[in-house]
Amino acid sequence: MSEISQAQPDYNYKVVRQFTIMTIVWGIIGMGLGVFIAAQLFAPMLNFDTPWLTFSRLRPLHTNAVIFAFGGCALFATSYYIVQRTCQVRLFSDKLAAFTFWGWQAVIVLAVITLPMGLTSTKEYAELEWPIDILLALVWVAYIINFFGTLVIRKVSHIYVANWFLGAFMLTVAILHIGNSMAIPVSFTKSYSLYAGAVDAMMQWWYGHNAVGFFLTAGFLGMMYYFVPKQAGRPVYSYRLSIVHFWALISLYIWAGPHHLHYTALPDWTQSLGMVMSIILFVPSWGGMINGIMTLSGAWHKLRTDPVLRFLIVSLSFYGMSTFEGLEYLPLAAES
């Protein structure tokens, strides 16, 4: 970020704007759907005796809309913006960028059609059937190629810390999605998981937990490491702490999935490992929160007038506080 070129590069802002607009659109739809199905809990007649309007079919659509449509479009938009600005070069491929936009919207629209129809793999956060999974994987691989291709052709020597988190989130989500979605198709709209029993449960929550850990945490931390310093007009509080934060987060988070499967058929050692990692995770999480908030050192006065900065700091504060949830495993640790 310290290296500023004299000539303004010709960035691809079109795809950034497209994803930003769809972030707003899908956010409204996804959260509106959440309000609707929440209302069904006290007024079941709101399903109007229509199968595709029942809670059990709309709830997966709500989670997919908020996580992958709303959150996904936000991540695409900001990562494409950040990688261009920090590398001072246009995206590696405009065609790949366009493919990721239209491909991602196609995945979302197909989810909107199939999930209310009851066409689902039954795996939480991975409900989409195998043809859509393949399309999603193709879009994601194109996304990875475009992002890392841009890093390769960058005009600055340094890879800014935000790109570390964004790159880690992309690679890990690819591995998680492909690994967990391995299935045996029996028709165009139905398949069965390649795994069975406790192994299937372990694969599912290795994916499910780390969808939160990398899609909704590492990716958004990449946003934080760019936009908080940018909005505050200050450098990152501690670059050394950001390095520790990065490696600690990606080293610990991937192991915590078994905490979704306590007191199940999963081997005890696996459950214990997930429990311990869940407790330890508050350390890198608080490191990131402190690094983000302390970046405002010398610029606290901007909170009075800058609403964007207020939202960023409040989100960091709630991120830090939410990590105390991991301490609920302390009684289990005592039992062990």
Regions found by a protein language model. Name each.
Residues 293-305:
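Alpha-helical transmembrane segments
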Residues 2-12, 141-159:
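Cytoplasmic juxtamembrane interface segments
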Residues 53-59, 124-125, 197-205, 269:
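Membrane-interface segments at the starts/ends of alpha-helical transmembrane spans
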Residues 1-17, 45-52, 192-200:
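Extramembrane terminal tails and long inter-domain/linker segments of multi-pass membrane proteins
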Residues 12, 57-59, 301-304:
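Helix-boundary and loop/linker segments of multi-pass membrane transporters
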Residues 335-336:
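Flexible, glycine/threonine-enriched loop-and-boundary segments that flank and lead into catalytic domains
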